[in-house]
Amino acid sequence: YDHISWLENKTIDGIIHEKTVKLLNSNIFVNQQENKDIALKIEKALTNNQSNKYFFGKDFNILKAENGFIQYQDSLGEVLLPEPNLLGDHQLGNISTAIATSRKLFNVKDEDIKKGITKIELKGRLQELKSPSKLKDLVGQNRLIIDGGHNIGASRAISNWVKKQNEDVHLIVGMMKDKDHQGFIDYFKDVVKSITLIDIPNQEGAISKEEFKNKLKGVNKEIYLANSIEESIKSASKYQNTIVCVVGSIYLIGEVLNLN
């Protein structure tokens, strides 16, 4: 539903129409939509498109296997892959789409896929900042995770990752004005130890931390306000055995990376 305000038809069907109506007939179309009903709508919308079409769950698939391995499968066969270096189970769908596209378009060897899957770099998506730096110094022995996701799908994916962690997670959030602030926070209110709201520097379209807090209802924990990225990270890092997680906007993550 990102950027739906720009659309005349603000329904799933309207979004699918805008996404598919101008697609050219090409060599390949790969779709990673996991919702079967939506995938069927997309497939129907592409009836007259002459591209070779490949749909997740139908033409290719990926599953978690034992001991951290993952199993990829398509018409070319199965590949047992090592655990990827991306955090979050939601990335498996993205990985499978990349593999499907590569195997259909290029003569990629299985061994190259196995090597590549352990060397993926994806900035700002459950990215852990590990190298010595200004912000890493603030968290000390704790972990610092950043994610620029700003929609409900992102908050669901990040919160699912949070649930699987052994450490307490302290959330730092800054968002733009036009996002679903309540819906975003709702996924975290019962799974994180604390929530700190901050302004996004240098962004006129960002919601202020005060307005953000006033909009939130039914959050059964104290919501803190911090005056800067550094202050919020330092405050959340006073606890030991902690994950400090900064989320809510790619603009915010850009500022974090600039500081780092």
Predicted regions and their residues:
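Nucleotide phosphate-binding/pyrophosphate-handling subdomain across enzymes
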Residues: 1-3, 75-194
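C-terminal helical cap/extension that packs against the catalytic core
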Residues: 34-52, 66-68, 139-146, 152, ...
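Active-site-adjacent alpha-helix immediately C-terminal to a catalytic or transition-state-stabilizing loop
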Residues: 254-260
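Hydrophobic side chains in well-ordered alpha-helices
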Residues: 19, 42, 158, 184-185, ...
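Acidic, Mg2+-coordinating active-site environments of NTP-dependent enzymes
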Residues: 1-81, 95-114
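Structural beta-sheet core signal
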Residues: 30, 171-173, 197, 246
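Active-site-proximal loop/hinge segments that shape catalytic or ion-binding/gating pockets
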Residues: 249
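A structural preference for short, hydrophobic beta-strand core positions in alpha/beta folds
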Residues: 55-56, 128, 224-225
